[in-house]
Amino acid sequence: MNHLATSKEDILAASRELIRENGWAAVSIRAVASRCSVSTGTIYNYYGSKADLLGDTIESIWREIFFQPEDEQVFKDVVACISWIYKRLEYGNKQFPGFFSLHSFVFMKDEKTDGKKKMLQTWEHIQNGLCDILKNDPKIRSDVFDQQFTERQFADILFSFILVSMIRQDYDPSSVYHVWNDGSSVRQWRCIPPDSSCNRTLYNRS
């Protein structure tokens, strides 16, 4: 038995390893204590319940998946950002098999609202990032978005495609690229009846 103090980082690392090896069902206070070679009481010093432990574990997995990229240009170009997101999702699926499955989402929802809350916070962070990039990508035409069709609305559309890909474990971003490259068709969905303002491409044309 390891009688030395165990840090929260060690506990979360052990939890991630258990999920990586055997999925969500493998995580329990007792299993994590055994992996850390400490008593269950040591784990309870940090987490009052399994649900609390899972909540922080979920957050730590999302952080590992969406670790800050070395190339900051990723956040200045929509296509580059989408490509990076899909690559990180593929990494996450390899490191934590089944993490993105529909079963896992239901599990997190049923287990404790804290896990669901932290998952939704991550999703909101991605959506906000897409929105910011849509506002700042210099290649996007300045007249594409307006009060009727905002950057936020298009970011939500892009994210919905990403979310479906995540659940299906399909890490080919081509469908999102298609929506992005043919952004005028997305605008037409919102124009009833269609008018000339719908006929816009997203990019500046030289």
Residue ranges and their predicted role:
Residues 1-6, 143-145, 191, 195-206:
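N-terminal intrinsically disordered/low-complexity leader segments
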Residues 4, 10, 14, 18-52, ...:
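Helix-turn-helix
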Residues 56, 70-95, 151-155:
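Hydrophobic alpha-helical connector segments
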Residues 25-26, 142-149:
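Short, charged helix-capping/linker segments at alpha-helix termini
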Residues 94-98, 111-140, 149-152, 156:
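Amphipathic alpha-helical packing segments from all-alpha helical-bundle domains
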Residues 89, 103, 158-162, 199:
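Short alpha-helical scaffolding segments that buttress acidic/His motifs in well-ordered protein cores
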Residues 59-66:
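Short, basic, alpha-helical segments at the C-terminal edge of helix-turn-helix-like DNA-binding modules
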Residues 86-94, 102-110, 133-135, 166, ...:
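Helix-loop "lid/cap" segments that line or gate small-molecule binding pockets
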